[in-house]
């Protein structure tokens, strides 16, 4: 895989070149006493660089200079300003030299090349690195400065250094084939001027370059006769090695994993920190000593590498089956299309290539995949979307996506000014004024909805604006005038909140699948359909829903375009507003009882994130604790001091789990939660799997638990039953599962629908524990993400839970049957949407993935609080900038003119 480091300073790069990249110690493939390295890139050729990497040329490039003349090509930048002893501001400068991009072969491939002694494998690694680097270079961008977008140049200069051992652990340097590639911080624009490189494009291309490297390497290894299977992370593994031998040859990996386990953190950033903190000092060993150590371990495990290499050489002489390559490539691109456009309306070409290459890993080459994709672009299946000028890669949508978005807009526009009013203005005003506690915005919205002549209208409601009371009043007015009122929502929790407003409600998915509730018992009767949390609805859901409504029905789409968007493709609620759907504005927030907090939330709701965060800082609501473990401990102590009506929000599941563990330990120490733990095996959803993934056997892993909503008569699988994956057969696309009765069945997952995949994990629970349900349970009348507190755990492990909410309600269940629950002290921002709590503690770590630290996260998390919100962060200085990140979904069609009467008018604005 490919890892890209944080930027190296000029001094760091030069030190690494001397002591790391070219050092002969523990690298037994070298030329003389040093590793020479090799130049790479179009810019290297332009500079006249070829062959071995010289120290002087490397140093000059690291300083932003011409490698031959020493002329300064890229200006240095100010690192940071500070006051010296005389009180004067000093602005030191140091050039950002570049980035260390490291391509690492999987352990089984390293053993094959280095212990098995097959130099052809090493050559395959080099070739794969070169192919991946060429593609990485294609998306290189220049930093232009100011607010101007980056410019794609497609060229860089890089220095490659191949190594064959990992860092030592207890004096042993394990075999690890990898290549360091220093990509220097310079590129050339079309006008011939040199500019600094825009690193964002490098990191955007990281997964793409990884897929190209792994795909090419796998293809070459199969040509050499090796049998390849997908490893735990999806990377290719050579078949024939036992896990014990792989572990014994991976002490460095185990060292890092142990450090991660102690810290409680996961992810690439945490792994990088753990790797740095666990480095052993350099131990100088001769090549013979290193090889002897490899040989000793290999002998202990039966010299597996030698056997693998010998069998591959024999296998290569056998004739490989002549598969229909063209059909395989087409299927891989189709998979990429289905997977990518299930969750996004617009997809970067690199993401499509990643999915296609992983689907056809080892069976096809990257050029074949690219050629197949380009042919389908030419046929009109994929449509290129006009960008805003800063994208490194092309962005595409599909003809089907464009059609769906246009259908929705045309449906809504066709119903404008064509439907009868629910009430006249003379009747609506007295109804709204009969609620003296309502504010002006609430009364205005009630009147606008009831007197509207549009078949479909919108209600844009800010977080905490008193929406539930408004909907209850609209329901009463509609029912008084002969409408059957039904509610729907994309989530079971939102549907439940509609029921709290006296509205018969269900999930949008059930309505689409089964035709709705038909509350009046007469399909011909006129209906008012309320769709809450419409901003979470996908394009497909919205189209299917609107196609089911009758000519006499009216629809009220309710949502907030500033809160989180749905998982699947599209943003129809926002898109309809852009296309001219008349939308009532419920814009007066009533949730926050603290005036200062209210002001901050108002700014966050208006996308004025920097102002909102600054106000929270001035109010003393931001605490800085750099160390993540100390920060989590502080959050846990704060929660434990006042657990009632307190909610913790964290951006990712890893930190959420760590916080939950810390909180329960605090509460157990205080006696609030019982100290007797009960171990239970609960299910956590595999959110990484799309519908396309669920049809591909290779995406399942042994131990996965599958839930069948529909079942299968052919395979004897009952609806709503569970089974556990035993094995998978990637070649035949078959999955073998063990059903609850112990019987095993094998089937092709592409032929079954209605399957959800989960991982089984062990959790400790105790009486007094706050839990969160992670899936809806109709028998218990529990919605997904509902919260409750464990009141009792019987001897047979039956759990009694008092549910949160205005009604005192206890549910009882067998945790061996209903396994969808987790600790509930901390929740993610997405899970918190729709919740209200007096006090909210928010973990805002600027080091997590930028897709999680966003303006939507800031708005949703802070606005949960009615009285107090406290933010805990690692970096106050960069917090506002991190939270200003926009993660809005894209749409295939842009309706720039809100008064546009034709959906096709918007089409011309967006699609090339």
Go through each PLM region and give its residues.
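Conserved ATP-binding/catalytic motifs of P-loop helicase motor domains
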Residues: 1-912
């Amino acid at each position: 895989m490919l890892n890209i480091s944080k930027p190296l300073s000029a001094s760091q790069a030069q030190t690494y070149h001397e002591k790391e990249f070219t050092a002969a110690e523990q690298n037994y493939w070298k030329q003389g006493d040093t590793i020479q390295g090799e130049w790479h890139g179009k810019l290297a050729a332009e500079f006249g660089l070829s062959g071995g990497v010289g120290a002087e040329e490397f140093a000059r490039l690291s300083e932003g200079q011409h490698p031959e003349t020493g002329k300064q090509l890229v200006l240095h930048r100010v690192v940071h300003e500070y006051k010296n002893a005389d009180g004067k501001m000093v602005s030191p400068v140091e050039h950002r030299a570049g980035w260390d991009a490291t391509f690492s072969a999987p352990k089984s491939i390293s053993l094959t090349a280095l212990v098995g002694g097959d130099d052809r494998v090493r050559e395959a690694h080099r070739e794969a690195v070169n192919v991946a680097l060429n593609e990485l270079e294609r998306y290189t961008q220049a930093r232009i400065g100011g607010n101007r977008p980056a410019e794609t140049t497609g060229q860089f200069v890089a220095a490659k250094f191949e190594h064959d051992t990992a860092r030592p652990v207890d004096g042993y340097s394990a075999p690890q084939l990898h290549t360091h590639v220093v990509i220097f911080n310079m590129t050339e624009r079309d006008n011939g001027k040199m500019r600094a490189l825009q690193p964002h494009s490098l990191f955007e291309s990281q997964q793409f370059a990884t897929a190209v490297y792994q795909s090419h390497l796998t293809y070459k290894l199969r040509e050499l006769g090796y049998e390849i299977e997908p490893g735990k992370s999806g990377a290719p593994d050579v078949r024939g090695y036992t896990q014990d031998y792989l572990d014994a040859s991976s002490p460095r990996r185990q060292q890092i994993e142990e450090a991660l386990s102690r810290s409680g953190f996961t992810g690439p950033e945490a792994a990088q920190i753990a790797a740095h903190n666990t480095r052993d000092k350099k131990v100088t060993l001769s090549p013979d000593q290193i090889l002897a150590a490899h040989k000793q371990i290999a002998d202990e495990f039966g010299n597996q590498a030698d056997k693998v290499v010998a069998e591959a050489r024999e296998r290569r002489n056998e004739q490989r089956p002549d598969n229909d390559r063209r059909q395989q490539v087409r299927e891989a691109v189709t998979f990429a299309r289905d997977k990518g456009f299930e969750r996004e309306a617009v997809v970067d070409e690199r993401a499509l290539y990643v999915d296609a290459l992983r689907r056809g890993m080892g069976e096809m080459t990257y050029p074949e995949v690219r050629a197949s994709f380009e042919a389908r672009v030419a046929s009109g299946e994929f449509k290129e979307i006009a960008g805003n000028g800063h994208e490194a890669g092309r962005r595409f949508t599909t003809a089907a996506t464009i059609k769906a978005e246009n259908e929705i807009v045309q449906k809504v526009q066709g119903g404008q000014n064509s439907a009868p009013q629910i009430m006249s203005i003379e009747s609506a005003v007295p109804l709204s004024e009969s609620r003296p506690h309502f504010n002006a915005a609430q009364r205005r919205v009630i009147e606008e909805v009831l007197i509207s002549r549009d078949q479909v209208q919108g209600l844009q409601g800010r977080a905490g604006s008193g929406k539930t009371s408004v909907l209850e009043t609209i329901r009463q007015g509609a029912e008084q005038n002969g409408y059957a009122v039904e509610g729907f929502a994309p989530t079971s929790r939102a549907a439940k909140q509609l029921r709290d407003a006296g509205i018969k409600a269900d999930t949008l998915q059930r309505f689409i699948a089964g035709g709705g509730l038909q509350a009046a018992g007469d399909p011909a009767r006129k209906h008012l359909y309320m769709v809450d949390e419409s901003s979470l609805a996908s394009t497909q859901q919205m189209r299917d829903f609107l196609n089911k409504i009758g000519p006499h029905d009216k629809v009220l789409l309710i949502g907030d375009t500033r809160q989180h968007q749905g998982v699947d493709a599209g943003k129809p609620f926002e898109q309809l507003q852009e296309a001219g759907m008349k939308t009532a504005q419920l814009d007066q927030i009533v949730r926050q009882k603290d005036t200062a907090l209210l002001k901050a939330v108002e700014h966050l709701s208006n996308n004025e994130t920097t102002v909102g965060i600054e106000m929270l800082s001035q109010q003393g609501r931001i605490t800085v604790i750099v160390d993540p473990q100390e920060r989590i401990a502080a959050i846990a102590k704060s929660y434990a001091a006042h657990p009632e009506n307190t909610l913790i929000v964290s951006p990712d599941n890893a930190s959420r789990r760590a916080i939950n563990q810390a909180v329960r330990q605090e509460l157990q120490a205080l006696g609030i939660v019982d100290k007797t733990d009960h171990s239970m095996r609960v299910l956590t959803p595999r959110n990484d799997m799309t519908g396309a993934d669920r049809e591909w056997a290779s995406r399942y892993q042994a131990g996965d638990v599958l839930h069948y909503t529909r079942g299968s008569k052919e395979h004897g699988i009952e609806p709503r039953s569970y089974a556990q994956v035993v094995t998978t057969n990637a070649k035949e696309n078959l999955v073998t599962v063990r059903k609850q009765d112990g019987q095993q069945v094998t089937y092709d997952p592409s032929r079954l629908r209605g399957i959800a995949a989960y991982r089984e994990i062990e959790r400790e629970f105790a009486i007094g524990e706050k839990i969160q349900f992670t899936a809806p349970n109709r028998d218990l009348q529990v919605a997904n993400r509902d919260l409750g507190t464990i009141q009792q755990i019987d001897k047979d492990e039956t759990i009694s839970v008092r549910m949160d909410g205005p009604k005192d309600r206890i549910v009882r269940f067998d945790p061996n049957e209903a396994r969808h629950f987790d600790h509930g002290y901390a929740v993610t921002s997405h899970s918190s949407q729709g919740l209200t709590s007096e006090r909210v503690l928010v973990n805002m770590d600027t080091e997590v993935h930028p897709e999680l630290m966003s303006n939507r996260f800031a708005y949703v998390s802070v606005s949960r609080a009615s009285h107090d919100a406290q933010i805990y962060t690692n970096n106050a200085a960069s917090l506002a900038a991190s939270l200003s990140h926009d993660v809005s979904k894209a749409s295939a069609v842009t309706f720039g003119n809100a008064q546009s009467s034709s959906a096709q008018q918007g089409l011309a604005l967006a699609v090339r």
